[in-house]
């Protein structure tokens, strides 16, 4: 294990202990925006961070757009509030988790009203999806249709759970609460969406494709979506480039030594 990773892991443990005592709203200033701007689509997202760094609003009608926390982590609970601050549109808002790269991740999205677009249909309501692209580049592997469809598997997108109905859409200017338990039990995720004290949806997903990754905010073709007051408990940082343990290094050394000896014997024979 590298010294840098040990320091990162220690910082994570100290942060977890502090959160256990009193969770504070996350500082979003270190998060990063990303938009998949497809040909013929809409502009890039504009994520406007508010003073205090605990709230951010995506202000424009954009192609699929993310605001990522840059932490490859597992075994955490995160929760906070979000809402649409306009009555001028009816599209997608939600969250991304287990994010590996721009074509491999889990997605929770919520559509206000049913609508067809780019040859696919979006039903009114909430959906949890999984995206698995071959190259890791969303602009190569995915399409606007992959993001829009929410009833059946499409392209590199698989539907994991749905809460669709004619009354399941989000409402304008209404505050909602989101909670995610991610991999507290290996291979298990739990999502809870509430409006005040009313639980609108609670679902558990069993899937171990991505057991660590980044968390972030997401919306698609929806302006004026505000996310605020998110808090996290737990969280274990996972080193994306682990250094081989000593035993592995020893085996690697023996293998290289054997290869060198073979080459010497071959040279002598010739």
Question: Which residues does each predicted region cover?
Answer:
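Positively charged n-region of N-terminal signal peptides that target proteins for export
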Residues: 1-7, 245, 263-265
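C-terminal membrane-anchoring or membrane-association module
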Residues: 260-270
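Short linear Ser/Thr-Pro motifs
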Residues: 17-21, 248, 270
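A short, hydrophobic C-terminal helix/tail in secreted or cell-surface proteins
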Residues: 244-262
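Extracellular glycan-recognition regions
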Residues: 24-242
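Gram-negative bacterial Sec-dependent N-terminal signal peptides
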Residues: 2-22
């Amino acid at each position: 294990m590298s010294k840098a990773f040990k320091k990162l892991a220690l910082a994570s443990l100290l942060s977890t202990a502090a959160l256990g005592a009193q969770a504070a709203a996350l500082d979003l200033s270190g998060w990063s925006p990303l938009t998949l701007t497809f040909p013929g689509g809409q502009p890039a997202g504009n994520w406007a961070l508010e003073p205090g760094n605990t709230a951010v609003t995506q202000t424009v009608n954009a192609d699929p757009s993310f605001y990522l926390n840059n932490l490859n982590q597992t075994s955490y609970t995160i929760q906070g509030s979000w809402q649409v601050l306009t009555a001028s549109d009816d599209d997608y808002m939600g969250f991304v988790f287990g994010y590996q790269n721009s074509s491999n991740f889990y997605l929770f999205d919520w559509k206000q009203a049913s609508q067809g677009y780019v040859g696919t249909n979006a039903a009114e309501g909430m959906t949890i999806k999984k995206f698995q692209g071959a190259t890791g580049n969303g602009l190569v592997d995915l399409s606007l249709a992959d993001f829009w469809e929410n009833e059946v598997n499409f392209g590199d997108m698989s539907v994991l759970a749905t809460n669709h109905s004619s009354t399941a859409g989000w409402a304008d200017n209404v505050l909602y609460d989101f909670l995610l338990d991610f991999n507290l039990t290996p291979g298990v995720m739990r999502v809870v969406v509430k409006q005040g004290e009313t639980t609108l949806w609670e679902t558990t997903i069993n899937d171990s494709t991505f057991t660590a990754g980044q968390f972030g905010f997401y919306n698609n073709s929806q302006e004026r979506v505000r996310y605020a007051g998110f808090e996290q408990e737990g969280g274990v940082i996972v080193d994306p480039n682990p250094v081989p343990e000593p035993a592995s290094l020893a085996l690697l050394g023996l293998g290289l030594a054997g290869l060198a000896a073979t080459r010497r014997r071959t040279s002598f024979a010739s």
